[in-house]
Amino acid sequence: MSLSIPDAFSFFKLSCGSWVSQRSSHHLLHRRAEPGASLIVVKELSATDDRLLSVAKLHQKNPNMLVGGCWVRWSGSMAWDQEGESHEGESIFGLIPTDENGREGLLLRDRGYAETAPVAGKFQMDEHDALLLSTSYDTMISNERFWFTGPDIRLRTSVVEGLSNTASFCIETRREYKAILNDNLNTNNDLMHSKFGW
């Protein structure tokens, strides 16, 4: 089962909310899998939001081409983390379609995931209404596929090639907004001590 989603911005709007993501990352060099988990918060931004306008300016793109975007914050951990190692951050995403249907185009970010420098990637919706993201960094290339099996379950696969060669699979489950207090990321003790590394 999958959802019918007309365009990429609709996909991002459907992704708004808070999510618990359970991940298995396969390190191809070591031939080992590493479990992990994260809490992700996504909020929609209008095309006129000052933060989106700043991202467009950062990438030297016409802000009038923006259809909207989102603010994303994440906090997580992986099983092999060293003491003091952190997987926390936030980013602004801006969408600029390059076709009249809004199903492909540019995804502007004020910071990346694999590398923290500002980055512009490409998005595309496939024939199954899944969202494909391709991002080229200085030292690696990331390809991701996101799709919904229902309004509250999102799946993700990702492959990173370069200095770090990994393949990952994530199951992301929606949580209610009331689980997020004062827009800060809070986790309960059960989640923090789960086998996924919290």
UniProtKB/Swiss-Prot annotation:
Top-level taxon in the UniProt lineage: Eukaryota
GO CC annotation: organellar chromatophore; plastid
Keywords: Lyase, Organellar chromatophore, Plastid
InterPro entries noted in UniProt: Calycin, CpcS/CpeS
Compartments reported by the entry: Plastid, Organellar chromatophore
EC number(s) given by UniProt: 4.-.-.-
One Pfam match: CpeS
GO terms assigned for molecular function: lyase activity
Stated family: Belongs to the CpcS/CpeS biliprotein lyase family.
Known role: Covalently attaches a chromophore to Cys residue(s) of phycobiliproteins.
HAMAP family, A to Z: Chrphore_lyase_CpxS
Protein name, as recorded: Chromophore lyase CpcS/CpeS 2
Gene that encodes the chain: cpcS2
